[in-house]
């Protein structure tokens, strides 16, 4: 570990769009703050700062950036302090150093630097959709595509479903497995890869990933949903909403949640007899 690290603070009214672009530029550690976000890395973030400023100019967005060099020992503690519990639907998501809350299904997530802790709109919406529509009476087995920290997989498992999970990032698979262990959960199967490596069909398929990948995998996502099963899609910017609705128009749209510039959908794969 290096003695110093770079911290880039970005403020903008279009912080969600800029944050997504920051990931495309190679950012791995992002902390959300009011009206913006903070990037941290042991490598110089000057190029990412420049790229964000250029992108903001092209889309007509305001932006304010500040880059500092800090001691590594400080930012680890600051990062922990910045991660607070959050409730979404039936679930209460907390880091292990916080207490659980009565009346909620408890989920412990100690977030890795690149993966979710439940605070983002897309994750929160997924948890709300799972809370409202997914139950053991209808659903027995689920697949989480792009599992990240494993938060959605763990939520489904806490409801009693057998869960498969996958991610193209090996570190995400390790993070999900570790978080599952902390929650007393064991996945039915977890692998490094995507839905194209899945066998069989599921009562619930969840994909909280970027819009382009959802569209690319649209046929595979639909193919792996059982008759009368559910498909939950999230991580979608509003500008892609119409394209998503068109690509999945052969499924029944059950509900759509919009939070700021993020869209989440739950579809049902009605069987041929409409039962």
Swiss-Prot record:
The UniProt function text for this chain reads: Methylates ribosomal protein L11.
This enzyme's EC code(s): 2.1.1.-
UniProt entry tagged with the keyword Ion transport: no
What gene is it encoded by?
A: prmA
Question: Does this UniProt record's set of keywords contain Cytoplasm?
Answer: yes
The record's listing under SUPFAM superfamilies reads: S-adenosyl-L-methionine-dependent methyltransferases
BP-aspect Gene Ontology terms = methylation
- This protein's UniProt keywords: Cytoplasm, Methyltransferase, S-adenosyl-L-methionine, Transferase
| A Gene Ontology cellular-component term | cytoplasm
Q: What class of enzyme is it?
A: transferase
Q: Which reactions does this protein catalyse? A: L-lysyl-[protein] + 3 S-adenosyl-L-methionine = N(6),N(6),N(6)-trimethyl-L-lysyl-[protein] + 3 S-adenosyl-L-homocysteine + 3 H(+)
Q: Matching Pfam families, A to Z? A: PrmA
Similarity-based family: Belongs to the methyltransferase superfamily. PrmA family.
Query: Which PANTHER family does the protein's record reference?
Result: ELECTRON TRANSFER FLAVOPROTEIN BETA SUBUNIT LYSINE METHYLTRANSFERASE (PTHR43648:SF1)
One molecular function GO term is: protein-lysine N-methyltransferase activity
Q: Tell me the compartments it is located in.
A: Cytoplasm
Under the heading Gene3D superfamilies, the entry gives: Vaccinia Virus protein VP39
Q: What is this protein called?
A: Ribosomal protein L11 methyltransferase
């Amino acid at each position: 570990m290096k003695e110093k690290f770079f911290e880039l603070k970005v403020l903008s009214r279009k912080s969600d769009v800029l944050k997504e672009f920051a990931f495309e530029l190679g950012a791995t550690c992002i902390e959300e703050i009011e009206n913006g976000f903070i990037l941290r890395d042991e490598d110089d973030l000057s190029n990412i700062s420049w790229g964000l400023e250029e992108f903001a100019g092209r889309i007509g967005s305001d932006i304010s950036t500040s880059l500092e060099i800090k001691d590594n020992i400080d930012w680890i503690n600051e990062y922990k302090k910045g991660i607070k519990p959050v409730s979404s639907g039936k679930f209460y998501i907390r880091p292990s150093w916080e207490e659980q809350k009565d009346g909620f299904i408890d989920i412990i997530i100690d977030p890795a630097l690149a993966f979710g802790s439940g605070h983002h709109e897309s994750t929160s919406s997924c948890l709300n959709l799972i809370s409202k529509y997914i139950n053991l009476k209808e659903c027995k087995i689920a697949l989480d595509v792009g599992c990240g920290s494993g938060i959605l997989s763990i939520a489904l498992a806490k409801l009693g479903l057998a869960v498969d999970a996958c991610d193209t990032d090996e570190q995400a698979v390790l993070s999900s497995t570790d978080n599952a262990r902390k929650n007393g959960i064991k996945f039915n199967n977890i692998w490094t890869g995507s839905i194209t490596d899945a066998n069989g069909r599921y009562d619930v398929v969840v994909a909280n990933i970027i819009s382009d990948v959802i569209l690319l995998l649209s046929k595979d996502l639909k193919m792996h949903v059982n008759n009368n099963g559910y498909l939950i899609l999230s991580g979608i910017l509003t500008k892609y909403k119409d394209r998503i609705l068109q690509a999945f128009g052969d499924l029944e749209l059950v509900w759509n949640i919009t939070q700021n510039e993020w869209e989440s959908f739950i579809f049902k794969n009605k069987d041929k007899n409409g039962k």
